[in-house]
Amino acid sequence: MKRVFLIVLDSFGIGSSPDADKFNDVGSNTFGHIVEKCFLGEANVGRKGVLCIPNLVKLGIINAAKESTGQYPLGFNYSSNVIASYGFASEISSGKDTTSGHWEIAGVPVLDDWYYFKEKQNSFPESLLEKIIRRSELTGFIGNCHASGTDIISRLGEEHIQTKKPIVYTSSDSVFQIACHEEFFGLSNLYKLCKTVRFILDQYNYKVARVIARPFIGNDKLQFQRTGNRRDFSIKPFATTVIKKLIDEKQGQVIAIGKVSDIYGGIGISKNIKSTGLYELCSTTIHEMKKALNNTIVFTNLVDFDSNWGHRRDVSGYAKGLELFDSRLSEIISLVQKNDLLILTADHGCDPTWIGTDHTRENVPVLIYSPGIKKNFLGHRKTFADIGQTIAKYFLLTDMSYGQNML
């Protein structure tokens, strides 16, 4: 029986990539800086002390981080009891966004640029907004700027409730984000609006990676908070991903947990399981691992690292999240059978100590555990697509166009 358990720790970078200078991210190091802040006692909100992640250490994260940056994370040394193969990978996609990272992991790097809304104010062209307003029968929008999602609902949420005008905003990523109140605007209305925006963007050749529904609740700016009902309406992959190949060539199953299905536009997904919160995502993953059949990929994205702690520059929260995940990792490891592969990686960085609120261009860990495979150092992988190619070889699929087998 062959099964792959692929877990993406969203934004868990381990040091700036060779091309980080093009993104003003030289020196960024999501993992390393979290470890440093914990060691120095500067990440003690809701937790305390040095970062405690024994299971990630056992899978080789410390050694991988050292190979990525040239030095061990503060307070750690070489781990001799590693049970997995470990390495690190750099991205060849042109962006440092979720879609690019995940598609490249699945063997389809995004080499051309996405369309970005670069203006900080009046970010979306009036002609585009007018098309959306006409088709959606809205009275208008508010926002139309670069913004943090939590900040903009605090600032404009009350006006949105009063006027029923959706809040639209973007970031340095290729995204069109829409925030609406679940009760006063309606969740189904928000999803319908996002589908309309996705259709119009595609119709008029705006190569925008994602339209994101950002629902929130609360009665005033002191109470507004985003809910777990976020949805991403992604552009469809340009080529066949390894998850689609598994279904097409082996009639296999791809179980998508969290926002994975949204990232691939539902393409190459057999079963989509919506799950929110780090603990619940881990529980759902464990549940699906226990019943996974032959030729199955269980594919989980742990979004909280990025959305709750990376973008919000919350070092303590990120550290606490890593420790929570590590506490669930022992059970995950115990479920991996002789011919299975457990792969832990990330899609980009989001250093919570870095300037601004955006992603950081970083190398990502590649940790592969299987009781049936001899452990070794995987080296510096030149593309995330090596993960997709490795999965293709493992399932005896036709070759992917990018990447090399690591095993």
UniProtKB/Swiss-Prot annotation:
GO terms for cellular component: cytosol. It catalyses: 2-deoxy-alpha-D-ribose 1-phosphate = 2-deoxy-D-ribose 5-phosphate; alpha-D-ribose 1-phosphate = D-ribose 5-phosphate. Pathway: Carbohydrate degradation; 2-deoxy-D-ribose 1-phosphate degradation; D-glyceraldehyde 3-phosphate and acetaldehyde from 2-deoxy-alpha-D-ribose 1-phosphate: step 1/2. Its cofactor is Mn(2+). Binds 2 manganese ions. It comes from Buchnera aphidicola subsp. Acyrthosiphon pisum (strain 5A). It is found in: Cytoplasm. Keywords: Cytoplasm, Isomerase, Manganese, Metal-binding. Mn(2+) 1 binds at residues 10, 347-348. It is an enzyme of class 5 (isomerase). GO terms for molecular function: magnesium ion binding; manganese ion binding; phosphopentomutase activity. Belongs to the phosphopentomutase family. One of its GO terms (biological process) is 5-phosphoribose 1-diphosphate biosynthetic process. Its EC number is 5.4.2.7. SUPFAM superfamilies: Alkaline phosphatase-like, DeoB insert domain-like. InterPro entries: Alkaline_phosphatase_core_sf, DeoB, Metalloenzyme, Phosphopentomutase_DeoB_cap_sf. Isomerase that catalyzes the conversion of deoxy-ribose 1-phosphate (dRib-1-P) and ribose 1-phosphate (Rib-1-P) to deoxy-ribose 5-phosphate (dRib-5-P) and ribose 5-phosphate (Rib-5-P), respectively. Mn(2+) 2 binds at residues 306, 311, 359. NCBIfam families: deoB (TIGR01696), PRK05362.1 (NF003766). This is Phosphopentomutase.
